Amino acid sequence: MKFNKMVSSDRGKNRKRHFNAPSHMRRKIMSSPMSKELRQKYNCRSMPIRKDDEVQVVRGHFKGQQVGKVVQVYRKKFVVHIERIQREKANGATVYVGIHPSKVLIVKLKMDKDRKRILDNKAKSRAKALAEKGKYTEETMETS
């Protein structure tokens, strides 16, 4: 069921908005889940990925245990390039293989003051949501 009349549920329109999204929106779209340890530490599930984060590929051909550093976040193509994930072209040159951010797990964050502030805000709002969760009891339901 649709709750907001102003938001379209048309598949074609949503795809158009996704693939024609400006760079500042692509940053948000290109978020990656965080490892269990980071989730516990920061009380936050996912973060927009950035250069110098350490990630682990969890899906696809390159999945495995080795951890690599993000070399480039290629917003135009919705992919990230990771340190040791390369392939050889026909002419012998090596190129990075693009991997979608949803298929990697952030293992270590590159921290700065802005990112710290974002994590604090996310943790605060999550704590507030947990505090409000289940606040309706039988008495409050009967009175309304």
From Swiss-Prot:
Keyword Transport assigned to the entry: answer is no
Task: Give a yes or no for keyword Secreted in this entry.
Answer: no
What SUPFAM superfamilies does the record point to?
Translation proteins SH3-like domain
What the entry lists under InterPro entries is as follows: KOW, Rib_uL2_dom2, Ribosomal_uL24_CS, Ribosomal_uL24_euk/arc, Ribosomal_uL24_KOW, Translation_prot_SH3-like_sf
Pfam families, per database record:
KOW, Ribosomal_L26
GO MF, one term, reads:
RNA binding
Organism superkingdom = Eukaryota
Biological processes, Gene Ontology terms: translation
Q: Which UniProt keywords apply?
A: Ribonucleoprotein, Ribosomal protein
Q: Compositional bias of type Basic residues: which residue ranges?
A: 13-22
Stretch list, region Disordered: 1-22
A Gene Ontology term for the protein's cellular component: large ribosomal subunit
Recorded family membership: Belongs to the universal ribosomal protein uL24 family.
- Name of protein: Large ribosomal subunit protein uL24
